[in-house]
Curated annotation (Swiss-Prot):
Protein name per Swiss-Prot or TrEMBL: Pyrimidine/purine nucleoside phosphorylase
Organism listed in the record: Sulfurimonas denitrificans (strain ATCC 33889 / DSM 1251) (Thiomicrospira denitrificans (strain ATCC 33889 / DSM 1251))
Highest taxon, organism lineage: Bacteria
Originating gene: ppnP
Record keywords, A-Z: Glycosyltransferase, Transferase
GO molecular function: guanosine phosphorylase activity; purine-nucleoside phosphorylase activity; thymidine phosphorylase activity; uridine phosphorylase activity
Catalyzed chemical reaction(s): a purine D-ribonucleoside + phosphate = a purine nucleobase + alpha-D-ribose 1-phosphate; adenosine + phosphate = alpha-D-ribose 1-phosphate + adenine; cytidine + phosphate = cytosine + alpha-D-ribose 1-phosphate; guanosine + phosphate = alpha-D-ribose 1-phosphate + guanine
Keyword Transferase: yes
């Protein structure tokens, strides 16, 4: 899906790590939500409450998911993150992403 229709976009940005990671929340009529964002080069750890599907639209990164070794992803790629976990990222180039939250 390259665009979303009939959605609500939350005006206030989600800002992490001093502005190096930012996103906007997109809410759908069925109650689901996604975030669209940009990650600048750097190393980050994120914690999840809900399961997530992370789609990388552009960029290059290394990821370490729970109980896994580091692996390199070149876009376009996606990965799943379990609920109530954390994952580590090493962003190599500016990375454009879409995060879908799974209930």
């Amino acid at each position: 899906m390259t665009k979303f229709e009939n959605v609500t976009v939350v005006k206030k940005a989600n800002i992490y790590d001093g502005g190096k990671v930012t996103s906007r929340t997109v809410e759908f009529a069925d109650g689901t939500r996604k975030t669209l964002g940009i990650m600048m080069p750097g190393e980050y750890t994120f914690n999840t409450a809900e399961a997530e599907i992370m789609e990388m639209m552009s960029g290059e990164l290394d990821i370490r998911l729970p109980n896994e070794d580091w692996k390199t992803l070149n876009t376009p790629e996606s990965f799943n993150v379990p609920a109530n976990s954390s994952f580590d990222l090493k962003i190599r180039t500016v990375t454009d992403y879409c995060c879908s939250y799974i209930k």
